[in-house]
Swiss-Prot record:
Organism: Bacillus anthracis
Active-site annotation: 78, 153, 177
Gene that this polypeptide is encoded by: gatA
Protein name per the record: Glutamyl-tRNA(Gln) amidotransferase subunit A
PROSITE patterns to which the protein is assigned, alphabetical: AMIDASES
InterPro entries: Amidase (IPR000120), Amidase_CS (IPR020556), Amidase_dom (IPR023631), AS_sf (IPR036928), GatA (IPR004412)
Function according to Swiss-Prot or TrEMBL: Allows the formation of correctly charged Gln-tRNA(Gln) through the transamidation of misacylated Glu-tRNA(Gln) in organisms which lack glutaminyl-tRNA synthetase. The reaction takes place in the presence of glutamine and ATP through an activated gamma-phospho-Glu-tRNA(Gln).
Length: 485
């Protein structure tokens, strides 16, 4: 039995009782990485020397009264979250040798909580993708079946947890990039409310949509991690000055009287029968615990995909303009003048999907097209947000599938961008509205790959979605199933 089969609270107790050491936890992580990483390919960079030194330092503090629950816990960090002195590439060749000179706020918070960073995790380049096949280095595989994708863009973050390489990880979610891979890999992934967690030190893809969040084996562990990284940050102008409650206090298993909304659009056209049936089965479980549900409509959700790709690509076009070979990152050797420097550095450094989205965004923002595309997309975004607010006026949570289907095979959709984009039709509206949502395991498809249940909450009401997710988790055994890698 792996140490990572235990929860954070169980491991904390074992540490305090000196049944295990922090070094044991770190070595467990690196041993597992040595055993499976050649197949899974979840990591881009390991930090073994520093992690082992930190473990030795923390071993001397075991038993101290001020040791928090995350003391000594091994974590993986998505490679678009900057880490001081530890290579951060965004899985792009243009940043292949970039060593940041500061830590992201979430990394600072986790260091203050005495977690240990095991390494940086693979992803779709600049977080643009749904399968991890867009990494500029190599594709991560799904631990449940190596012929299948782990999802994206936080595929490395989800795969590392599912494979038992780390206890938990950080991902980022712009249109579903935490929840979709969590669903595909059979783990728990939360996208917090926009502004709940600082984005300072997150390399921007789409600044009005990006949000950092936790990926874990259980809902309880997820709540521990969110508790540690949440809160106002003066270094992030979009960080919200909203009190962070005690997420653990609400994990009572009680959902009696809970009002659940189920959008008909989330069980209709484009959603597979397996995903639909898994949600209906989950609703039956929650009904048996005293919750009620009704069908509702999010009428503008059918426009979410087009709206998202116009807005996110426009923001990416602006954000990625900084990668030009002048200040940092890879610089092309094929340069005769300044224009060559810009053009060749970006042409050689960016992958196809990143170029595709930059081109789309630049077009949408260009003179003569701005009103027809970008401005119109912003107006539709407001309508989508209003749809959520209207539903939440009468219901506590919204529930549906995380993805239309289970994970698909490697190479199956990589040459068809529109089919690939459609994997995110159920997660994208949440980002456009800025509300929080969690994906928890809820069954398996005919291909024996995991399915995820998406629970969506009101702005800054992560406590309620944790309560519902935990109650469902404890009433079922889906979270106890593990990839037999």
């Amino acid at each position: 039995m792996s140490l990572f089969d235990h929860s954070v609270s169980e491991l904390h107790k074992k540490l305090n009782n000196k049944e295990i050491s922090v070094t044991d936890l770190v070595e467990e992580s690196y041993k597992r990485i040595a055993d499976v990483e050649d197949n899974v390919k979840a990591f881009l960079t390991l930090d073994e020397e520093n992690a082992r030194a930190k473990a030795k330092e923390l071993d001397a503090k075991i038993g101290a009264e001020d040791n928090g629950l995350l003391f000594g816990m091994p974590i993986g960090v998505k490679d678009n979250i900057v880490t001081n002195g530890l290579r951060t590439t965004c899985a792009s060749k243009i940043l292949a040798n970039f060593d940041p000179i500061y830590d992201a706020t979430v990394v600072q918070k986790l260091k203050a909580a005495d977690t240990i960073t095991i390494g940086k995790l693979n992803m779709d380049e600049f977080a643009m993708g749904s399968s991890n096949e867009n990494s500029g280095f190599y594709a991560t595989k799904n631990p449940w079946n190596l012929d299948y994708v782990p999802g994206g863009s936080s595929g490395g973050s989800a795969a590392a947890v599912a494979a038992g390489e780390v206890l938990f990880s950080l991902g980022s979610d712009t249109g579903g990039s935490i929840r979709q891979p969590a669903a595909y890999c059979g783990v728990v992934g939360l996208k917090p409310t926009y502004g709940r967690v600082s984005r300072y030190g997150l390399v921007a893809f789409a600044s009005s949509l990006d949000q950092i969040g936790p990926i874990t084996r259980t809902v309880e562990d997820n709540a521990y991690l969110l508790q540690a990284i949440s809160g106002l940050d003066r270094m992030d102008a979009t960080s919200a000055n909203v009190e962070v409650g005690n997420y653990l206090a609400g994990l009572t298993g009680d959902v009696k009287g809970l009002r659940i909304a189920v959008p008909k659009e989330y069980l209709g056209e484009g959603v597979g029968e397996e995903a639909r049936e898994s949600v209906l089965a989950a609703l039956k479980v929650l009904e048996g615990m005293g919750a009620t549900w009704e069908e509702v409509s999010l009428p503008h959700s059918k426009y979410a995909l087009a709206t998202y790709y116009l807005l996110s690509s426009s923001e990416a076009s602006a954000n990625l303009s900084r990668f030009d070979g002048v200040r940092y990152g890879v610089r092309s050797d094929n340069v005769n003048n300044l224009m060559d420097l810009y053009k060749n550095t970006r042409s050689e450094g960016f992958g196809d999907e990143v170029k595709r989205r930059i081109m789309l965004g630049t077009f949408a923002l260009s003179s003569g097209y701005y009103d027809a595309y970008y401005k119109k997309a912003q107006q539709v975004r407001t309508l989508i947000k209003n749809d959520f607010e209207n539903v939440f006026a009468n219901y506590d949570v919204i529930i549906g599938p995380t993805t239309p289907t289970p994970a698909f095979k490697v190479g199956e959709k990589v040459d068809d961008p529109m089919t690939m984009y459609a994997n995110d039709i159920l997660t994208i509206p949440v980002n456009l509205a800025g509300v929080p949502a969690i994906s928890v395991p809820c069954g398996f498809g005919a291909n024996n790959m995991p399915l995820g249940l998406q629970i969506i909450g009101k702005h800054f009401d992560e406590a309620t979605i944790y309560r519902v997710a935990h109650a469902f988790e404890q009433a079922t055994d889906h979270h106890t199933k593990k990839a037999s890698l």
